[in-house]
């Protein structure tokens, strides 16, 4: 799975180890929670 802090797709949160893909604090990307 994708570790925390790695870029991810909000449409596919299951790719993250945490099952959560969240907006980055200041960059316009999503990262695993």
Curated annotation (Swiss-Prot):
Q: Which domain of life is it from?
A: Eukaryota
* Keywords, ordered alphabetically: Disulfide bond, Knottin, Protease inhibitor, Serine protease inhibitor
The site feature described as Reactive bond for trypsin is recorded at: 28-29
Query: Which GO biological process annotations does it have?
Result: negative regulation of endopeptidase activity
Molecular function per GO: serine-type endopeptidase inhibitor activity
Q: List the disulfide bonds.
A: 1-17, 8-21, 16-32
Q: Which InterPro entries match?
A: Tryp_inh
How is expression of this protein distributed across tissues? Answer: Expressed in leaves and fruit flesh (at protein level).
Family, similarity comment: Belongs to the Mirabilis serine proteinase inhibitor family.
Instruction: Please quote what the entry notes about the protein's domains.
Output: The presence of a 'disulfide through disulfide knot' structurally defines this protein as a knottin.
Q: What functional role does this protein have?
A: Inhibits trypsin (IC(50)=471 nM).
| Name by which UniProt lists this protein | Trypsin inhibitor 1
Query: Lineage, please?
Result: Eukaryota, Viridiplantae, Streptophyta, Embryophyta, Tracheophyta
